[in-house]
Amino acid sequence: MARSFITKDANGNPAIRKPRGGEQMYRGTPRYCSMAAHQRRDQGRVDDLWGWLHTLVELHCGLPWRNERDEARVAKMKGEMAPEKLCERCPAEFLPIHKYLTILKYESRPDYFAIYTHLLEGIRRCKSSFMYPYEWEDSPREVETALSISENSITTKKPATKVHMARRMYPQARSEYFKENALGF
């Protein structure tokens, strides 16, 4: 199901694997996959992000093609769907991510920090927090209790603050982590 996109060049240095020509084996779920998958082209990092974005839209408001079973019709709907229409009932931050993905190519290294920043803007705009409980959590105190016990037993007997617990549970990524490019791609 997966294929390495990094190989070695003639000198033995890491290089991005060139996309294979011709029709490729279909990998994916029609509802979530990228247009490259529908078109049987080789897939890169951007195609993973298309699957991720389609999943977010599905979870938030449902994809327009969610009831369609025919792959060709799903591909046609995706190809004809304006980004504004797809994202109209989604958080405002989804649209710039969608538009950004449309400019990426197979070999492109996505700007993950920009995507992350858009998502954080949405969290801030909604005045939300990583510490808010999910709907399925019985009590907002469950997470705090679990983290406090863990935190106190490992480091100190002082109770952990909400901010400290949030950092432990959901560390805020710093831009240098996203910009770090250990493989050079």
Show the residue positions of the predicted features.
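Conserved C-lobe helical segment of Hanks-type protein kinase catalytic domains
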Residues: 36, 96-103, 118-121
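A short RP[S/T]Φ-enriched loop at the C-terminal end of the protein kinase catalytic domain
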Residues: 46, 106-113, 127-128
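Extended, low-complexity, intrinsically disordered C-terminal regulatory tails
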Residues: 70, 79-89, 113-117, 124-185
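A conserved short alpha-helix in the C-terminal lobe
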Residues: 47-59
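Conserved end of the kinase activation segment
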Residues: 35-47
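C-terminal lobe of the eukaryotic/viral protein kinase catalytic domain
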Residues: 51, 61-106
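Hydrophobic anchor on a C-lobe helix of Hanks-type protein kinase catalytic domains
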Residues: 37, 59-60
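Activation segment/activation loop of eukaryotic-type protein kinase catalytic domains
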Residues: 1-31
